[in-house]
Amino acid sequence: MKNILAKAPSKSGTYAMFIGRWQPWHDGHRWLIHQALNEDKKVLLCVRDVPVSESNPWTADQILLNLADSLKDLIEQGHVKIMKIPDIESVNIGRGVGYDVIEHVPPQEIHDISATKIREQMKQEGKL
């Protein structure tokens, strides 16, 4: 796994960072990272290492493998890096930190995508 994570050579050293559980990775997440990719930014996806539970049925390592498979081409092309981080309780910044804090507001059809509903459907279909 480390080879995949380390493969993203960059034209510049900066990334648009997204922190999440990605449980599961879905079209809403894809839309979100493509907002940065469409602006020719590289993306760093941080997978929170949360305890397995009903709302987090996969381990962070399983999510990393899923992301590596789903985003293989973007990773190999150097557009995306993925990494596991410890679970967090907040994101804190100071003034003049040297980067922007950006909120992407999705269109309604993307906003309506729910990982909770996806997990419930997967349970009903015996996939979880």
Show where each model-derived region lies.
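Nucleotidyltransferase catalytic core that binds NTPs
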Residues: 1-128
